[in-house]
């Protein structure tokens, strides 16, 4: 008995990663210029800022790591209570592709060393909160 080989090639799905978003909560008044100057683990050409948008982009291998000031969106009384209780002065949305997580961790280590703070979930109650070891 002869078995015929299936000539159709099976498609191998490539993991493209997932875009995730957190809030980087910082206990100091920090601008995107401050953020970009604190990051040394990537080439200067990979970093770009838009001061008028208060936005920083770092081009990584799968996608970009983007920090955008979101302080003006935390206007609800519950938000204000959370920020005050945690001593947060500025909030940046941080979005990145999960395929870049190792480099994102290096960037976050540099930012945490320079400014402190923590990452909060993009959820209604901002929980859970993540420390650098969680990345």
Question: Where in the sequence are the language-model features?
Answer:
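Acidic, proline/glycine-rich low-complexity IDRs
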Residues: 1-22, 30-49, 95, 102-135
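Short, intrinsically disordered low-complexity segments
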Residues: 12, 26-99
